[in-house]
């Protein structure tokens, strides 16, 4: 049994709810910071006197920070108590976003967004471990899903508010608001999450042993491949709606809301399903993803059904809490690094999906071809899952024969 598996919560029910709320609030802040840049692209370009494609580089700098920071900070912080590490990561995040708000030039902004992205994956990894550690064993994935719910709510509510604030006042105030939310998370976690003196301490080199586990790599690969279809469709959603469905540009924000609703449902469903089915929940979610992706091109022909389909696309986020919990189960003593690396895998999916979708569109297959590309990547995730099951059975058979 891993150190996240405790028979009973070590906090009161009231504190349990408040801790999960505080951890989700940190995810809410991160979600606003990650996604609001897209909605404020024009304002940032005007404020820094750069082109919108250059703002795209700013977005990429943040994503690069996530990929680099997730394993790096998990290894560096391995020897610290998780409570301390959580607090430091959110202070770091607040400072990174404050620096972004004050950035005077394009190159400074690139650096600030890279720095702001560094704590992203490590925070979600450690927050998920903390949420699981205070939960009964049969509610671990549900608790992880509630932490990740912050990201979905940010997409649903936070980003429209941040975009509105950036348009009415300045995009810099949106960055500053994220810093305030991050500091509120620090205060809430410090007030409600008690120290855990019996928590096992790790050594940085021991954390690296996570990558000696084939099941860790396979779980990360499922996320990087199987999750990319969602990003493939989402990245080209606006032009698909206007060019294929005939949706007026003024209604595009409704599509973002629909996607956010799906994300909220997915975060809840993914954790609930994994608590009941364990790793067997993953192929169920991937098959659902295949169905959703294959029906999207058909739904895109209807102004009504396309919004139903967009909600369904958002529910594909159910993979996140399922895979996050799977990594906790297979990482042995190197849980911090494995859990943090999950978000590096998701950012890989965020890069892979739009790239594959762009290739299909450029080849002349049309805007709705993103659905078929997404179905193919979900099938790829199923193949990786099958490989993981085969490898796990082979390992058990080998141990049994010894």
Give residue ranges: language-model regions:
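Helix-to-loop junctions at the C-terminal end of transmembrane segments
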Residues: 70-81, 266-278, 361-362
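Cytoplasmic helix-loop-helix junction between adjacent transmembrane helices
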Residues: 112-150
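C-terminal transmembrane helical hairpin of 12-TM major facilitator-type secondary transporters
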Residues: 280-323
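Helix-loop-helix hairpin linking two adjacent transmembrane segments in secondary transporters
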Residues: 106-108, 136-194, 240
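Conserved MFS/SLC helix-loop-helix module at the cytosolic interface between two early adjacent transmembrane helices
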Residues: 68-107
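Helix-breaking motifs and short loop linkers at transmembrane-helix boundaries and internal kinks
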Residues: 49, 81, 102-108, 246, ...
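A late C-terminal transmembrane helix in Major Facilitator Superfamily
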Residues: 330-366, 374
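Paired small-residue
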Residues: 92, 96-99, 107-116, 304-312
